[in-house]
Swiss-Prot record:
InterPro entries: FAM174-like. It is found in: Membrane. Residues 30-123 are extracellular. Belongs to the FAM174 family. Residues 145-190 are cytoplasmic. One of its GO terms (cellular component) is membrane. The gene is FAM174A. This is Membrane protein FAM174A. Residues 172-181 have a biased composition (Acidic residues). It is a single-pass type I membrane protein. Pfam families: DUF1180. Residues 43-63 have a biased composition (Pro residues). Residues 1-29 form the signal peptide.
Amino acid sequence: MKASQCCCCLSHLLASVLLLLLLPELSGPLAVLLQAAEAAPGLGPPDPRPRTLPPLPPGPTPAQQPGRGLAEAAGPRGSEGGNGSNPVAGLETDDHGGKAGEGSVGGGLAVSPNPGDKPMTQRALTVLMVVSGAVLVYFVVRTVRMRRRNRKTRRYGVLDTNIENMELTPLEQDDEDDDNTLFDANHPRR
């Protein structure tokens, strides 16, 4: 196995692992963008007025009523929630009782669209840790490979020509007018 192929393969492996680790991170925003594109009414200019959701009425939410399916509980998705956020999903996790409190009426707007989404700082920390781990693995593999190469060099004496271990002595020449000086490498002691 050649060293250039190993480094190339190692860098490709690290890049693919990093990409696979980042795909779940990127799938959340990508899914939100795709949902927003599907919910968009047309290709015309965006509506200049801000999109707001109407306040929820007090009482049990549609998701808490027994006998209703998930599709019915989510409500219509056309003009109401163009950004793909669903305030009902946030209320399901907050209020498991039979009655919605006063704080749960406006609380749906502060909940992220997908509770599985991580904040930006946590994503950045995850990416930083993955890159640090990849660099650590690279240096460990490189150190192990260098030790193996040094062991083989010591065992077989291949390419073991360190300048400290050499003693340079001039060769005897018949021609004295030649300016080229040749040296012989003698290893002193081993």
